């Protein structure tokens, strides 16, 4: 699966990110990784879904829905679940899971590379 993000240039950091994530859910076709979602959470008030990735060859096969459904089960008792979609075209996908855009919330990023 290709990662169309800057973090894909740092495979050793990605491995560490998986190990240090609160929840990681993956989808496989045999021994091929075809989907992945990971999150960080304090398991009390808030979780951040860092990204949801699906191999382009497997998109439109409901893999993203399966990954979201599985990871969201971990957040039933939290006050907030945050996500920062990297592509505007994915916003309707997240809206199906109850995510909304609010005028008084803005995401900010500090790039250190």
Regions found by a protein language model. Name each.
Residues 55:
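Residue-level recognition of the GNAT/N-acetyltransferase active site
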Residues 77, 81-112:
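Conserved active-site alpha-helix within GNAT-family acetyltransferase domains
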Residues 8-12, 65:
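Structural motif corresponding to alpha-helix initiation and N-cap regions
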Residues 1-9, 105:
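Short amphipathic alpha-helix that is part of the acyltransferase structural core
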Residues 58, 62-67:
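Conserved acetyl-CoA pyrophosphate-binding loop and the N-cap/start of the following alpha-helix
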Residues 13-52:
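A conserved beta-strand-loop-helix scaffold within acyl/acetyltransferase catalytic domains
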């Amino acid at each position: 699966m290709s990662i169309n993000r800057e973090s894909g240039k740092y495979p050793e950091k990605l491995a560490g990110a998986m190990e240090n994530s609160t929840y990681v859910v993956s989808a496989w076709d045999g021994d091929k990784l075809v989907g992945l979602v990971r999150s960080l959470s304090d398991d009390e008030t808030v979780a951040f879904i860092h990204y949801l990735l699906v191999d382009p060859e497997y998109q439109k096969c409901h893999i993203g829905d399966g990954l979201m459904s599985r990871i969201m089960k971990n957040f039933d008792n939290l006050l907030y679940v945050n996500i920062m979609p990297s592509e505007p075209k994915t916003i309707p996908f997240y809206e199906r899971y109850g995510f909304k855009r609010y005028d008084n919330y803005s995401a900010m990023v500090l790039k250190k590379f």
